[in-house]
């Protein structure tokens, strides 16, 4: 069984946590994140260490305990280092470009798909077939990357589509003729 909730979170230099009635604000060099946590979970800040405690050992409290600790750690990492999801496009004529804060995708449709960057998330297009989704909130970076991928997810026959860098796409054999 996982014991993630019992691990202590160590704050890097330049990161500050303010806990007021389980509404936690984390400030760091990359920005600020605020999130409300369950009232039953105790969050204590002592110097550069943050501990998360639970009132009892019920199954519900154990799950909330681990999730709270993981979310809090993601906030600390986000404001100090940030998060990045890299996507790659494979297919003839598939390309991406930036227009202001919008991501414009040509993925084999009769029209171009436009994706507006949500608040706190930015797009980077180092090459026409590579997209980086960058931000301080892990949840919104992951959701935005998943949405971009869903516009043309990789198909199993030729492998065309948008995929995460390093993602394995299982290939199928096509029909055989008579």
Swiss-Prot record:
Q: Name one Pfam family in it.
A: Ribosomal_L6
Which keywords belong to this entry? Answer: Ribonucleoprotein, Ribosomal protein, RNA-binding, rRNA-binding
Q: Where is the signal peptide?
A: none
UniProt key word RNA-binding: yes
Which InterPro entries did the record assign? Ribosomal_uL6-like, Ribosomal_uL6-like_a/b-dom_sf, Ribosomal_uL6_a/b-dom, Ribosomal_uL6_bac-type, Ribosomal_uL6_CS
A GO cellular component annotation in the UniProt record: cytosolic large ribosomal subunit
**Molecular functions per Gene Ontology:** rRNA binding; structural constituent of ribosome
The record's listing under Gene3D superfamilies reads: Ribosomal protein L6, alpha-beta domain
Example GO biological process: cytoplasmic translation
Query: What is this protein for, i.e. what is its function?
Result: This protein binds to the 23S rRNA, and is important in its secondary structure. It is located near the subunit interface in the base of the L7/L12 stalk, and near the tRNA binding site of the peptidyltransferase center.
> Record's family?
Belongs to the universal ribosomal protein uL6 family.
Describe its assembly. Part of the 50S ribosomal subunit.
Which named protein is this? Large ribosomal subunit protein uL6
Q: Which organism is it from?
A: Streptococcus agalactiae serotype V (strain ATCC BAA-611 / 2603 V/R)
Q: Gene for this protein?
A: rplF
């Amino acid at each position: 069984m996982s014991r993630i909730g019992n691990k202590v979170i160590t704050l890097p230099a330049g990161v500050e946590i303010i806990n007021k009635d389980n509404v936690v604000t984390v400030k760091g060099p990359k920005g600020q994140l605020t999130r409300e946590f369950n009232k039953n979970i105790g969050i204590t800040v002592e110097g550069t260490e943050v501990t998360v405690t639970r009132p009892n050992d019920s199954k519900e409290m154990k799950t909330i305990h681990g999730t709270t600790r993981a979310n809090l750690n993601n906030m600390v990492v986000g404001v100090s280092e940030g998060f990045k999801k890299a996507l790659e496009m494979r297919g003839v004529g598939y390309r991406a470009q930036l227009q202001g804060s919008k991501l414009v995708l040509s993925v084999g449709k009769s029209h171009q798909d436009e994706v507006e960057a949500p608040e706190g998330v930015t797009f980077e297009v180092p090459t026409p077939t590579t997209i980086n989704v960058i931000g301080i909130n892990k949840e919104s970076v992951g959701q935005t990357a998943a949405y971009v991928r869903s516009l043309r997810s990789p198909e199993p026959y030729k492998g065309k589509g948008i995929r995460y860098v390093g993602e394995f796409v299982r290939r199928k054999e096509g029909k055989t003729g008579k």
